[in-house]
Amino acid sequence: MNEPKYIVTVDLDLPPLKSGLEPYCAFAQFPSASNLKEEFINSVQRMWTLLKWARHCEVMVFDSVSGPFQPDLLACIFMRFLSKRPVVIMADDMWNKGGTLKYAFQKMMVRLADPSIDRYAVHSLGEEKIFAQLWGIPHKKVRACIYNYTFTDEEVNAGAVATNGYIFSGGNPSRNYDLLLEIARQLPHRKFVIATRTLRGRKDIPANVEIVQVPHLEFIRLMREADMVITPLVSGGTKSSGQQTYLNAMRFGKISIVNGKDVLGVTDYIQSYVNGIITDGTLKGFCDVIEWVYDPVNQEAVHKIKELAQETVKEFTYERYLRTMTSIIEEVIAESRN
């Protein structure tokens, strides 16, 4: 391989830059690991490869969630000692604060890496406000890159949208499924289907809840045929999550129900009772909303929310996300030239 000048370790199909530089998508080059030992070996190899590339590269877009050992962030720490370094953008899901020790260690790593990082591209306006203070880096380096729905037109149009008598929820990270199980216990007359691996082996699943682990296309079908889609998010986090689930639900014209109190990002996409419903995150709040959606008296309002969901979600495309990310990269390049 010739020495690439523009390297992307995030799984993004970024376009060429104004200068004509074509991105080298390195995401597929780094293998996934099946155990912690493999993960450590792969991370060391990845970090070393990134440092070798950094010696001749002009632009690098790094993955903030590159693995438990964070090789991309570690590479930035060592890049401080290069005589000449590339423009670096740190992208993707960023970091949650976590417990006291975890937070202190993560903050130390970020601050050590920060001199090598020109921009942090976060996924919500709320993160953009708190990120700099949270991690001890300059606010001028932080930009919001609002996320996108992920189902393709082919996947969305692969079957008829239906309402088959169940409430759907899915996804793995940052979900409060304990709350959802309690909601199901409070509403025994409603059926719930939850597609996740995080509840595997649980013995306390209510009779009206079906737990499934399904391939991608079956996940889409379950969402397509649900009465509504609930995304119960863990509150108090320092990064946004769940966007794929509730935006994909909106593409199907589903009522998308998400808790918004102490949760970042939700209001970037959803206006409550306009194109979705934002709850306060309490047990009663979720139960009341579910019954409101099912109430025949409210079907005209429900229909309007569904229509607006399908209409407003159109702006949150993958192409828009790539354009925003590219503009962030171009901004840094222009600054470096000046």
Over which residues does each language-model region extend?
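A short, histidine- and acid-enriched strand-loop-helix "catalytic/donor-clamping" loop
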Residues: P86-Y103
